[in-house]
Amino acid sequence: MFQDNPLLAQLKQQLHSQTPRAEGVVKATEKGFGFLEVDAQKSYFIPPPQMKKVMHGDRIIAVIHSEKERESAEPEELVEPFLTRFVGKVQGKNDRLAIVPDHPLLKDAIPCRAARGLNHEFKEGDWAVAEMRRHPLKGDRSFYAELTQYITFGDDHFVPWWVTLARHNLEKEAPDGVATEMLDEGLVREDLTALDFVTIDSASTEDMDDALFAKALPDGKLQLIVAIADPTAWIAEGSKLDKAAKIRAFTNYLPGFNIPMLPRELSDDLCSLRANEVRPVLACRMTLSTDGTIEDNIEFFAATIESKAKLVYDQVSDWLENTGDWQPESEAIAEQVRLLAQICQRRGEWRHNHALVFKDRPDYRFILGEKGEVLDIVAEPRRIANRIVEEAMIAANICAARVLRDKLGFGIYNVHMGFDPANADALAALLKTHGLHVDAEEVLTLDGFCKLRRELDAQPTGFLDSRIRRFQSFAEISTEPGPHFGLGLEAYATWTSPIRKYGDMINHRLLKAVIKGETATRPQDEITVQMAERRRLNRIAERDVGDWLYARFLKDKAGTDTRFAAEIVDISRGGMRVRLVDNGAIAFIPAPFLHAVRDELVCSQENGTVQIKGETAYKVTDVIDVTIAEVRMETRSIIARPVA
């Protein structure tokens, strides 16, 4: 009788529209209940029975109930699920399988089955890729997933690498394909095989993509030729190899091994500038005046060279610092090293005075055993030989940026606009509280940015520098020439790593068009989007593998008195993040470890400080001693405690 009653339908509609609702993101806790976070200020309690309908991270719309002045949320509609494709560990046997997502806040096993055509008998402990197929808020009875890919077995020593690559959907091995012969590009190659070119790399490097030759000129000036490996002499634009490189965009460097952008035959052999092998190169000849200025007679040309020596960073640095046993194999090579050190000195001074020089941070290298076990982690400081190569590459990239800008008006540029204009006033106000006066408009110009950076570098600590980092914009890849505030340069376009960066291959093709006097096509903006996304994923993958290896390495230090010096890198409401100085591991110090009485403790991300009883006890960039309290292998997190 009430079936089609329009009044009843209207009443229902009215009740529905009058019931308060909120949209937000579900935050799970370890205690079964959760919260619907609407924004930074507002959240609603989700009781345990209602949490069974949702998952941490789901974006939902919920009905808000008020009882006895307590509000709670009842999930009603799924806006965007947190999990779609994910990796996890399989539980159970073939007929009754479940998968536990590999995520710190997702503990529940999700029932699942293997997808059709996936020929693997899954067993307890296997790692797999899965895709969500059912969700309670979509009208399904429960969560359900489908296993779409087997990754590896639970006890595989190389789980950190295979799981991380599968999680981010990145390639596990080098691309297939061979390049049998060089293309006829219509380029005249200058024969420079008689010159004493050298490469300087790590001892284990196989993909050498830059060689250097220096010459003293009569008037105190120096000439530098930077010769770069020439993969575009083998790989035609639009070919199968080119398309594969375009998708990968970069060689993926993970602790212990890399997954190259090009087939290894090219990256480690045919294109690699090996000692005593004749190789085609794209080269840049530049003249440096006595103060390190790059003069206007920049020349790009195609050539063939034969590297005369594969030098190693540490050996070259030792020799220049008059330590160690290593000697250059001939006076000619020794002379090259001396001249390159002079160039480095001049360019370093020029950049210090006219641009910006990054503070030296050590690189951390994992030393791994046969089974992927971490034998040691060593900090490798950036020494004179590293700086020789760095200064030569930066100079060469400045040259390419100028030539592409002036001759074509486009290229693949690294652009960094400094501070976000929306933040300029807040930035000026913050600096003022620390006694630095800047003009909010001037600081948005390249000169103003450089001036501020030099003032910050002159501060006794890096504290203020760390406070303003959040006001900076991100570096971008652009086809349009633009400034790079971070380097303090008007334009910057890389072409010195074409074996491992697709953008550098594009710039090679554009520079070759300039050399031949041909017209060139502007690269499509989509390629910069792909490159930026791949760069992001590769960085996350490197961090994920690193976290896993750090957890393995420090596991036996948990609960011991072993002390580590640690730099505070971030402060949040829940505690502090620190970086261990000796090995680069990131650890978390929970707030209760800082001070037992919560009411007397203020952890401020805004100010970058921890106050105890109103006094600043810790601030970002402080270095403190810590011990390792706990290592949680399932979440790869390291919990530290300050030494009292």
Swiss-Prot record:
Domain RNB: 189-516
EC number: 3.1.13.1
Every S1 motif domain range: 561-643
GO CC terms, sorted: cytosol
Keyword Nuclease: yes
Keyword Lipid biosynthesis included in the entry's annotation: no
Swiss-Prot/TrEMBL GO biological process terms: mRNA catabolic process
Source species, domain of life: Bacteria
Keywords: Cytoplasm, Exonuclease, Hydrolase, Nuclease, RNA-binding
MF term (GO), any: exoribonuclease II activity
InterPro entries: CSD, NA-bd_OB-fold, RNase_B_OB_dom, RNase_II, RNase_II/R, RNase_II/R_CS, RNase_II/RNase_R, RNR_Ribonuclease
Compartments, as annotated in UniProt: Cytoplasm
Primary localization: cytoplasm
Similarity field: Belongs to the RNR ribonuclease family. RNase II subfamily.
Biological role stated in the UniProt entry: Involved in mRNA degradation. Hydrolyzes single-stranded polyribonucleotides processively in the 3' to 5' direction.
Protein name, per record: Exoribonuclease 2
Species whose genome carries this gene: Escherichia coli O127:H6 (strain E2348/69 / EPEC)
Taxonomy of the source species: Bacteria, Pseudomonadati, Pseudomonadota, Gammaproteobacteria, Enterobacterales
Gene: rnb
